[in-house]
């Protein structure tokens, strides 16, 4: 630093300067010397850093990555522990969950030990190592990354967030194996996905926070509130998260502060607390300080300067008009993104806290303390341990008079029995946290227990609730008695019985295949499928040809040709269309039915049910939609074909006839050309009334003309009169459905079905020809054979033609895997298929066609045959020599174990003689004087509340689920939990598994029976008896004094329940005879303090510092409403939400006029609900539910006072903050206050406490005005 700048006093920091220390130096300089000189100092530090960084030339190379030599031995120790845990699991001593948790804990502890070893190795061998200096100075990287580089990567999480119990033993220097690389990619991907998802959540959280707090602006200097809050150091689990000094800096004192011993004045009321003053307060030994807070500020919908304190950016009292609500929202919301970004730095590596453990410093004997109660429990690793119910001391006495004591807090767990001998470094106990009411957040989860071997299920000491399928609280074991289990379809007949002994090659089961209909046999080329053909039909009078467009056609001998709709070797069903053809006209026209009956079908138009005639009156219709002046033809004009109809358009008629124009206003929308003969009759008007009808052949017309064929009499109105027109009619004969071909037995037939595509009297507008009706050939099958598939067969007839054949197929022998599980049978048995018929053989109905036999490839004894109706399978158990073990013994009478009876279970490792141990767990099936025979079995320990998937006696395959183990685990405190927890608190959500809370202060009494009962005895003789649910354990001890609202059991705390408890305590129970307003103030204050602490602990767990005042502003907005119970003489309605300050003023006004007061209760709203219930309906409508909010505001006739920033921005006003604050100054801030009181308040700003006592020069930037 420059000498002239510090000529009066030189300051020297004699320590290693890392990232944290540089931060502290800059903060100290800023507080003591102002921004200008701090900027100069930072410049100097930057130059100094670059100068020496250039000289040193520190870089990272592979040689800098030093792997501790102890790594191999640590990994070997962990492997040995895991092997021992696996042996306990195989013996049925611990459950699958306990094994899993133990393995996870072993690897995590190993990883942490190795991490410490990495640090120690760097310190002792190479303290100037580049990697070590970079990470520990805070320049680049962190300990977790260093650990992954030179230690071990550790445990990873799978895509569901579950920890994989296979850790990555390698580090990045050694390189990962293929398996480790795949597992590693899980965590890395999970990190990226979580970051993407949580970033959106964080942004939405910020939006909600801004919405609730945007109206909070510094509008007053001093609200003169007598209320405040007590600040203490924030602790969790006995660890200080935020010191009292850090919490005090920037706040304003509520009262004068005196030294507790000398009683001298330390600081005055309304004095802001600087760093130096905070030091003085801590030195004085004060543990708690009353300060002003936004939570207790009396300013209406705002905060005053004194209750807010410093603007943390400048280190001095906040100015009027500062939008502190927006700052608070951003301060809480912005680090939400950081809460998720942490995954990138660790790559999804799992981390967790290890419980504080006590190990033996020397060999000796353990002695439990006297007069202390212990409760035997089972740890989460399956070990027996003792839970300490009161604070106590554990004593270890060694040889030569060595003695040491260990302090145990209530809730600690002792791992060694009383008066047991221990060796050095043996684990003695795990210490519970000393923090009051400490509870680890837990969550219920499940894990599938799957069997490792196939065999028979046997329950041992297992009691199951039949209704829910759950194990009772005692637990028990499931044994799987080994054997080969065969899965057979229910179609198979087992030809053996229980107790049969079979040899290799014996038939276990068979299934026979019989023809249900009879017919000709057709074998496939691979002889794997047998098909019986009960019926077939060949169309003799038609052949298939391919036309010019490569479309197959069916051509009949009567020259009718149909378009084929099927292909060769395709499967058909009853009623399917085989071929079809259409009758097409030359132009559009009018259709009329004559003696026809038709029914409507979905797609095929109108199907003919009765034969008759179809009359067709042709006409050519051009849809032009043009102005009348553009039309070149006239109404009633006869025109030849090819005449141009529209000016400048190539629209010409294809047929000659008389023109009829259809007008709509000044437009011609249609030009109709009607072929026919024009009749010139003088009295056309009278004859036109007889028109629009059919004229039969031979009929006289006008007593002059004889009509030779069927005609239609029409007329056209022209400008000169009426023209009569004799139009041609085409008659089509239409037939009802008929069979055109059938087989000999009438099983199959082809029917011809005709359908008309238009309804009677319909006019079809067209220039081109249209498809008038169609003829379809449909395949019909007899009722008894409809469910069988029908296959097509094109039989070559000549070079370019085929004959068409239809075959009804009965498939007799489908693929084998339909009837048994080939994967299971592969190693146990083989399937043999026998076909008992020949190709083209005629078989009768009920004749045997083929059979499948299951042949054993092992020899052994059939012990069980059973059905599994749920899975539609039959299972068969075969015990072979592989499942039997013979143990030789010397003398039956000298056996140590007296429990050796037939049918008993024995576990591996048990001694039956001095030199003989049982090699495998199993069931005793034979005892002789020279040997014992065991059936190899596997025991599985089942915990309480597990859901059982099998029944005793069931047969199971290896890998099948036996039970669903239900257990509780501590919630991981990683990044994934951070943001949801903040959201849960700020949205004031009710927890799923909430703990039991004390309703009043008192002493506890515990009663243990089938359930745990807890009684609270208060000093005023109010007793409350609470019963805990099964599986829920108390967190308090006998005769422990507890406060109201304290948690008594495990689980999450419900904020709403705390609020209700304290309100009942302060007001409804009338303990202190408080007024309604005071009771609400006090009960809300408890909630506010709880929420501030909880939010801070989440952010502090991730190393993020947020000032209390920001959180307090948000929580003030959440707790500033009350719910009306009775409106009294006010206009308020029950359940209406209103601001607490507003109802207080209303009640105060009514009390002076002796009116009936409104009654109300406190309520806690989440940030979303608070935003929607704000006074400004413009702000609320712009947030969510716009229509509902605006409609409600309109109905209630609300007026928006435009006090916040958001509503002013929306309507285009100047915002009431910063420079725009003065525009609102007159009415909003100094209302009902005189000038004299303003001067008194502002004079405090110039008190000595606010002046800079450490600086000799005025700061050139901050104090230039």
Swiss-Prot record:
Keyword Nucleotide-binding listed: no
Cofactor note (record): Binds 1 Zn(2+) ion per subunit.
Gene3D superfamilies: 1.10.132.30, 1.10.150.390, 1.10.1790.20, 2.40.50.100, RNA polymerase Rpb1, domain 3 (1.10.274.100)
Catalyzed reactions per annotation: RNA(n) + a ribonucleoside 5'-triphosphate = RNA(n+1) + diphosphate
Amino-acid positions noted as binding Zn(2+) in the UniProt annotation, renumbered to this chain: 223, 297, 304, 307
Pfam family, one: RNA_pol_Rpb1_4
GO terms under biological process: DNA-templated transcription
Bridged cysteine pairs (disulfide): none
Xref: NCBIfam families: rpoC2_cyan
Job description of the protein: DNA-dependent RNA polymerase catalyzes the transcription of DNA into RNA using the four ribonucleoside triphosphates as substrates.
Family stated for the protein in its record: Belongs to the RNA polymerase beta' chain family. RpoC2 subfamily.
The protein's name: DNA-directed RNA polymerase subunit beta''
Organism: Cyanophora paradoxa
Lineage, broadest ranks: Eukaryota, Glaucocystophyceae, Cyanophoraceae, Cyanophora
Encoding gene per record: rpoC2
